A protein has these predicted regions:
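Metal-dependent phosphoester-hydrolase catalytic domains
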Residues: 25-29, 128-129, 159, 173-181, ...
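N-terminal active-site segment of His-dependent metallophosphoesterases
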Residues: 25-54, 62, 292-296, 305, ...
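N-terminal, active-site-proximal structural segment of metallo-dependent hydrolase catalytic domains
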Residues: 2, 21-95, 107-108, 261-264, ...
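Extended active-site neighborhood of metal-dependent phosphoesterases/phosphodiesterases
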Residues: 91-96, 113-117, 124-128, 132, ...
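His/acidic metal-ligating clusters that form di-metal
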Residues: 144-151, 162-201, 294-296, 401-409, ...
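Short, surface-exposed linear motifs at loops/turns and structural transition points
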Residues: 266-371
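Structured beta-strand-rich core segments of catalytic domains in phosphoester-bond hydrolases
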Residues: 51-52, 76-149, 244-246, 319
């Protein structure tokens, strides 16, 4: 009796040790990188070990811990006597919490035998093509997902049928536009004729030098690698980030997986068009975003040429493998029209000693012109408090087109990209704003309102913009006109409970007080023939006794400041305060709000020495006109 107990305990201990070793090996798999897919192929032989004992949970644990996105599964019984009525793929799907796709190749023992796919994502559709197979029916199961298609197969063991199967697979994929992965038990080695044929259209992704079966099972295949994962290379490139074979000696085949980054099609590399910013000091910033990490540059030149190239180096190293791009072109000639385009080459693999690249995207060719010092004419548009109202901006876009309004640059004066939750939301609306402004040709100035300060991505907004001097306030000259832009911060005190002690706008206002003093005393400001002040929250004309820290901090400085006009927003109510009517030393205009019936596009137009201000509603009706 004791001998039996000892024997049973020994078996349990050995089983536990082996299982622990197996799971430890799986748990050592690398974390999947961003923008990659983990593909596994696994001939599970009905989830039975080498002795034919069903091991559903062990197989499921191996798959679950490897955490693949999709698994090509071969040798599956469904409700056969051999499987004791169990639908093997359904059992594995339930235990791994993955979607299942099964096709039957032939009837067997009152059930079915076939191929399957496990996937985290529900397939859009699936289909099967039959392959040559005299010994038993063979086939290829295709499943389409959002970004790729996977084909699961198990080829015949007969070489002639393997070769013929390759041609059938080629025919099945010839019209597919998405990336295609082929995965399965090929029943042949890497050096075989069928493998050579496959490699004419497919890239082998797993390491063919690693055994995928116990060598003893196939003594005629010295490399013992017969399970493969491939990528169809007609329209895509594949970077292998990781690959692994999980050795399980008690099973007929080892699970194999690869982490792959699929190259993006050229038309999906750019996330935004280029947009122009900071047209100051004989330079301009060209910004854009990409969907994938890239190596970027700008091609530009005069007279329609693109004979100059700008790349970015930081401390001697190329600034690349990123998605947000700000290229500063400097030492440009004022008054000269430049052509440019932006270029981004996808980086699919960036390792210490190895780099791989996808395709290169080129934007259309655009133009810009920086003003000369003596430029006296310009037209600028100002929008405020849009609050992500797409319909409103579309109406203004139509108005601009109908009036054939030519302009040089655009201000978005706060509460435009309001309460940004994340980058996707912020960039999504920024794209709309850039489209309205035609920002690839006309520079845009994104100014901060109180709502740009709120929500999780508020601090992230600055990654999208190239602020003058790196601050959300500043000044610049357009020809003989000086623009001064201020940031009023929040509309409540820093101690307000909803800010949780995370704001210090008092300091920001103090910093701007010092900036204002220096700016008003500066040569550029004094020599300008026209001077324009822009900020989001009004300082003048507010409710008496209301919170107005900017007036406290800046009021004395602005009391005698010779601005020709100040343009504000924030209140959602259009207002005009003539000079001196509210303690203001210059005319003040407050733009409207996000509702179509109360929204206005503000137009500043300078011709020679005359500066004209107009406020237009969405129909083009003039709310106010000032000759300044």
């Amino acid at each position: 009796m004791n001998r039996k107990v000892f024997s049973f305990a020994s078996i349990l201990l050995l089983t536990f040790i082996h299982l622990s070793y197996t799971l430890a090996q799986v748990s050592a798999t690398p974390e999947k990188e961003e923008n990659s897919v983990r593909i596994m192929t696994y001939n599970v032989r009905n989830a039975c070990d080498i002795n034919g004992v069903a091991s559903y949970q062990q197989v499921a644990d191996i798959i679950h811990q490897a955490n693949p996105d999709v698994v090509a599964v071969q040798e599956l019984d469904s409700a056969t006597q051999r499987a004791r009525g169990v639908d093997v793929l359904a059992e594995l799907g339930e235990r791994t919490m993955m979607f299942t796709t099964f096709v039957s190749l032939y009837d067997y023992q009152k059930g079915k035998h076939g191929l399957g796919i496990l996937s985290k994502e529900r397939p859009i559709r699936h289909w099967m093509v039959y392959l040559p197979g005299k010994d038993q029916a063979r086939g290829a199961l295709f499943a389409e997902f959002k970004d790729y298609i996977i084909c699961c197969t198990q080829l015949s063991k007969i070489q002639e049928e393997q070769n013929a199967s390759v041609l059938v697979i080629f025919d099945a994929i010839k019209d597919i536009k998405k990336p295609v992965f082929l995965a399965g038990d090929m029943n042949c080695s890497y050096e075989s004729a069928s493998q050579n044929a496959l490699q004419s259209k497919f890239t082998t992704l797993n390491d063919f030098k690693q055994a995928t079966i116990p060598v003893i099972n196939e003594p005629n295949i010295p490399t013992a690698c017969i399970d493969f994962i491939y990528g169809y290379s007609a329209n895509y490139k594949y970077a292998v980030l990781a690959r692994q074979v999980i050795s399980l000696r008690e099973f007929d085949h080892y699970p194999v997986f690869v982490d792959v980054r699929i190259s993006s099609p050229v038309d999906r590399i750019f996330r935004t068009k280029p947009y122009l910013q900071k047209p100051i000091d004989n330079g301009i910033t060209i910004s854009w975003l990409t969907n994938v990490p890239v190596h970027s540059w700008v091609e530009y030149g005069k007279n329609g040429n693109l004979d100059q190239k700008k790349q970015l180096y930081v401390d001697g190293q190329m600034l690349c493998n990123n998605k947000t791009h700000h290229f500063r072109l400097e030492n440009l000639e004022p008054g000269v029209t430049y052509s440019y385009r932006v270029c981004s080459r996808e980086i699919t693999l960036y390792q210490a000693y190895k780099k791989e690249f996808g395709y290169t995207a080129y934007s259309d060719i655009y133009t810009f012109t920086l003003p000369s010092t003596g430029t006296s004419d310009f037209t600028a548009l100002v929008f405020n408090d849009v609050h992500k109202n797409f319909d409103l901006m579309e109406k203004f876009a139509r108005l601009i087109k109908e009036k054939d309004l030519k302009y040089d640059f655009v201000f978005y004066n706060g509460d435009v990209i309001d309460d940004p939750k994340d980058q996707d939301q912020a960039v999504g609306f920024m794209k709309v704003l850039n489209e309205i402004a035609i920002a690839e040709k006309a520079p845009v100035f994104y100014m901060r309102g109180n709502h740009e300060i709120r929500n999780a991505y508020s601090i992230g907004l600055r990654s999208l913009f190239d602020y003058i001097n790196g601050t959300t306030y500043g000044a610049f000259s357009w020809g003989d006109t000086r623009f001064v832009m201020l940031d009023c911060g929040e509309d409540k005190s820093d101690s307000t409970w909803v800010y949780y002690g995370l704001n210090d706008f008092n300091q920001l206002r103090d910093d701007q007080a010092a900036f204002l003093k220096k700016e008003l005393a500066g040569k550029e400001f004094k020599k300008a023939t026209k001077k324009i002040l822009i900020h989001h929250i009004p300082i003048y004309g507010n409710r008496e006794g209301g919170y107005n820290p900017c007036l406290e901090k800046w009021g004395d400085i602005l009391a005698d400041a010779p601005f020709d006009i100040a343009i504000n927003g924030h209140t959602h109510r259009f207002a005009y305060h003539p000079k001196g009517s509210a303690g203001n030393n210059f005319p003040v205009v407050v733009g409207g709000g996000p509702r179509i019936e109360g929204a206005y596009m503000l137009v500043l137009q300078k011709k020679g020495k005359q500066l004209i201000f107009r406020a237009l509603d969405v129909e083009g009706n003039e709310k106010l006109k000032l000759e300044l």
